[in-house]
């Protein structure tokens, strides 16, 4: 986690020094590029800080969830458009939403799906294909996010939701240029548990990774155990 915080801070400080020196004043295109990098790193740092605070609140049972019947289509459409615009490689989304709603906190569910899409793009091949599907069982809204990425070993699948854990496949990809937060999947797991739901991973190395989320339907007590 310290490394994840130091890297964006170092980049921001480097850009600040370059701007302060005036060396880029006569090079507006390069100056704008570095300012964009600093903004991106600031966003990464802000996201990491929010994850740490949210996980801390979840662990201490102090995070309030505003669960309502939320529309899934607007959440997913907004996220797919965002990631298509920012991705540095081709990304194709295949969407099939049989279940149109879920009983959840709108903002936190959006963050969960965003984390899963972000991971799918980071730890993927040069051309990314992401399937997002939903369906409804008798007691659950079921949401799946599947990619054609590097995959995760069976050993890593057992620990991938632990705090600060990053699987070997992700580490390999990171050395090749991807970056990410070790808290990401723990954050996802904690938020889903706060919804009294469950998340599972299924993966084959070199082929795909699929995350499946079970969110209980709205009931008087809303207490289900898988």
Regions found by a protein language model. Give the residues of each.
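Glycine-rich ATP-lid/hinge loop adjacent to the conserved G-boxes
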Residues: 24, 165-179
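Short alpha-helical segment of the dimerization/phosphotransfer core of two-component systems
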Residues: 40-45
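Conserved micro-motifs of the catalytic ATP-binding
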Residues: 60-65, 97, 101-104
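Short helix-loop "hinge" at the ATP-lid/N-box region of the Bergerat-fold HATPase_c
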Residues: 120-121
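Short conserved segment of the HATPase_c
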Residues: 152-165
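Conserved glycine-rich
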Residues: 196-197
């Amino acid at each position: 986690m310290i490394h994840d915080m130091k890297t964006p801070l170092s980049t921001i400080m480097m850009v600040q020094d370059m701007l302060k020196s005036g060396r880029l004043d006569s090079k507006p295109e390069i100056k704008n590029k570095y300012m964009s990098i600093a903004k991106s790193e600031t966003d990464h740092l802000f996201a990491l800080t929010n994850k740490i605070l949210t996980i801390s609140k979840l662990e201490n049972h102090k995070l309030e969830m505003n669960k309502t019947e939320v529309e899934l289509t607007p959440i997913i459409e907004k996220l797919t458009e965002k990631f298509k615009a920012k991705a540095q490689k081709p990304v194709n989304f295949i969407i099939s939403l049989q279940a149109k709603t879920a009983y959840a906190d709108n903002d936190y569910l959006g963050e969960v799906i965003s984390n899963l899409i972000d991971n799918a793009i980071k730890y993927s091949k040069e051309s990314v294909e992401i399937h997002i599907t939903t369906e409804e069982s008798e007691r659950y809204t079921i949401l799946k996010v599947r990619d054609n990425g590097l995959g995760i070993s069976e050993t890593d699948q057992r620990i991938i939701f632990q705090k600060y854990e990053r699987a070997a496949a992700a580490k390999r990809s990171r050395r090749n240029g991807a970056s990410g937060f070790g808290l990401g999947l723990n954050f996802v797991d904690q938020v889903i548990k706060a919804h009294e739901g469950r998340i599972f991973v299924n993966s084959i190395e070199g082929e795909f990774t699929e995350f499946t989320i079970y969110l209980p339907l709205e009931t008087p007590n809303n207490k289900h155990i898988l």
